[in-house]
Regions:
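Residues located in well-ordered beta-strands
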Residues: 137, 149, 163-165, 224-226
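Conserved coupling/switch loops of ABC nucleotide-binding domains, chiefly the family-specific signature
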Residues: 129, 163, 273
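ABC ATPase nucleotide-binding domains
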Residues: 8, 12-149, 153
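Elongated periplasmic alpha-helical coiled-coil
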Residues: 68, 156-158, 162
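Non-catalytic connector elements of ABC transporters
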Residues: 157-159, 168-284
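Positively charged, low-complexity/disordered segments
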Residues: 1-7
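Short, conserved clusters of charged catalytic residues that mark active-site
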Residues: 2, 91, 145, 222-223
């Protein structure tokens, strides 16, 4: 399903049953399906209207109804919300989520919108130039991205990727940012392979929401970075800090007052760390 209406002069009743008529389904079955689906989608009072008389959300529901009456085993949604305004996209996203839960039918949903993918998907395949980068649950996509492309694609702002190298001392491993001597311990990290890590060039990944202005856990790692920029977006602010000439973004409540140009004490939740090989850009 992509476009929310067919020809503009076709009444919605005819629009919804078009596929059944083409398949030469009996009139009785057509009326039965039309009544059941239109009530389910709450568009039964709209069937005698033309597309120009309906709202964007109503047109989208009728388009879904046109597919539903045929009782498919799999739905393909090809960017169905791309032509809707922001408010209506949110409303229709909820509608599609409810529909999926009620029908318990397989849905293949194509979108460039990460919010749609994360909120609707039970399994997400992220593609780049036609190649699947990661096929996983939304939770694993967010918490354990398979490479820097996925890490950068998911999240707003996306994951901080700080370039540096690892230092291995016996069973202890540290991250040192390029141009810095400061060591960040990452002993709890789940490495795929823990051999030959010393001097390995990597990207240290940590999401902005896992950096805190106030300590949230005793295990949080304390850092002091210079605050360079503040972006106020209502209930929260996005702060940019300097870490060895690399930008680090963090999300804080807008009520927190942070002075720009000053050194600020921050706390990193290192349990949320991701590490990527600097050459292959794959998770290690």
């Amino acid at each position: 399903l992509r476009h929310s209406s067919a020809a503009s002069d076709v009444y919605k009743r005819q629009n919804m049953i078009f596929g059944l008529k083409q398949a030469k389904v009996s009139k009785e079955k057509i009326e039965e399906q039309l009544e059941k689906v239109s009530k389910f989608l709450q568009v039964d009072a709209l069937l005698e209207r033309k597309p120009s008389q309906l709202s964007g959300g109503q047109r989208q529901r009728v388009a879904i109804g046109r597919a539903l009456v045929r009782e498919p085993r799999i739905f393909l949604f090809d960017e169905p919300l791309s032509n809707l305004d922001a408010k209506l996209r949110v409303e229709m996203r909820r509608e599609i989520k409810k529909l999926h839960q009620q029908l318990k039918t397989t849905v293949v949903y194509v979108t460039h919108d990460q919010t749609e993918a994360m909120s609707l998907g039970t399994n997400i395949a992220i593609m780049n130039h036609g190649v699947i980068q990661q096929n996983d649950t939304p939770e694993n996509i967010y918490n354990k991205p398979s490479n820097t492309f996925v890490a950068d694609f998911i999240g707003s702002p996306s994951m901080n990727l700080i370039k540096g190298k690892l230092k291995q001392n016996s069973d202890k491993v540290y991250f040192i940012a390029s141009g810095s001597n400061f060591e960040i311990p990452i002993n709890g990290y789940d490495f795929k392979e823990k051999n030959n890590l010393d001097n390995k060039e990597v990207f240290f990944g940590l999401r902005p929401e896992h950096i805190f202005f106030k300590r949230s856990d005793e295990k949080d790692f304390e850092m002091t970075l210079r605050a360079d920029l503040s972006e106020y977006i209502g209930h929260e602010q996005i702060m940019t800090f300097d870490y060895s000439n690399q930008e680090v973004l963090a999300k804080f409540p807008s009520t927190f007052k942070i002075e720009l140009g000053k050194e600020t004490k921050l706390f990193f939740d290192l349990s949320q760390t991701s590490l990527f090989d600097a050459k292959s850009e794959e998770r290690i």
